[in-house]
Amino acid sequence: MDKLKAYKALTKVIPQDLVLLDEPMKNHTSFKIGGPADIMVIPETIDQLKSAIKLSKENQMPYFIIGNGSNLIVRDKGMRCIVIKIAEQFSKVSFQGNTVIAEAGILLSKLSKKIMAESLKGFEFASGIPGTLGGAITMNAGAYGGEMKDVVKGAHLLNDNGEVRYFTLEELELGYRTSIIQKQGYIALDVELALEKGDYQEILEITRDLTERRTTKQPLHLPSAGSVFKRPEGYFAGKLIQDSGLKGQRVGGAQVSELHSGFIVNVGDATAKDVLDLIQLIKDRVYETFHVQLETEVRIVGEE
């Protein structure tokens, strides 16, 4: 695997300013941690995206897709691969009656505002979820009683052979924090949402209420990756962590949030090792106290 050879091949078909060598992943994750990616490509077109995938295969370099990096922990040694970032360069939105077709790179917060402006309801739950639409459908993101599978009609997905196909809701296999996209390594290009006509003022009030609940109950002022753990059946992860005496627990620059124990926050120059050591401490303590095995919701990637 020769990263310089791959870099040269990529810059022949993709503008050089969109291909970054040894790019620090802390600049591309909401946790603000993570070592360098060998190569990062930020494609602006589907053709550039396909070229990046094709060349990664030809150069025997694996590729990894990110959006806003808001559900991601990258280890300190970084990533020995080509990271392909699908973000604001893919953020077109169109409306056809109550149907919304949005590209995968749009932030959920921006999409929510556009949907609200059309007086369409059903997407309010997603208004405060950090991250892109592509990331949200990949993990079937949800909050406050709603999740992506409630509003998704279908999506265009790209496979590693460069083929694009439309998948229906059923074919997407959206489950609790999972989907066929995640299982098969597909890439979401755009998503079709089926919503309902609503009253603008009511939609605005619901959105404001959810925003207020988030602001008062979640540590939005500090870098984090959102909820660290999946919800164990019959329990709430945050309550188990708090009742295990871990609220405010710190390892290096990583801390269990004082505001919401389900969050780990970066209180200053945290390393991925700090975060991962704290995750292990939490898992061990919760198991010792309640005999409940916590599973991480965040994706943990990179070289050990």
From Swiss-Prot:
Q: Name one GO cellular component term.
A: cytosol
What cofactors are annotated for this protein? FAD
Q: Where is it mostly found? A: cytoplasm
BP GO annotations: cell division; cell wall organization; peptidoglycan biosynthetic process; regulation of cell shape
Q: Which residues are the signal sequence here? A: none
Keyword hit for NADP: yes
Its UniProt pathway annotation is:
Cell wall biogenesis; peptidoglycan biosynthesis
Q: What class of enzyme is it?
A: oxidoreductase
Keywords tagged on the record: Cell cycle, Cell division, Cell shape, Cell wall biogenesis/degradation, Cytoplasm, FAD, Flavoprotein, NADP, Oxidoreductase, Peptidoglycan synthesis
Q: Which residues form the FAD-binding PCMH-type domain?
A: 33-213
Q: Please report a single Pfam family linked to this protein.
A: FAD_binding_4
Report the Gene3D superfamilies cross-referenced here. Answer: 3.30.465.10, UDP-N-acetylenolpyruvoylglucosamine reductase, C-terminal domain, Uridine Diphospho-n-acetylenolpyruvylglucosamine Reductase, domain 2
What's the EC number here? 1.3.1.98
Q: Which InterPro entries match?
A: FAD-bd_PCMH, FAD-bd_PCMH-like_sf, FAD-bd_PCMH_sub1, FAD-bd_PCMH_sub2, MurB, MurB_C, MurB_C_sf, Oxid_FAD_bind_N
| Reported function | Cell wall formation.
State the name under which the record lists this protein. Answer: UDP-N-acetylenolpyruvoylglucosamine reductase
Question: To which species is this protein native?
Answer: Alkaliphilus oremlandii (strain OhILAs)
- Recall the taxonomic lineage recorded for the source organism: Bacteria, Bacillati, Bacillota, Clostridia, Peptostreptococcales
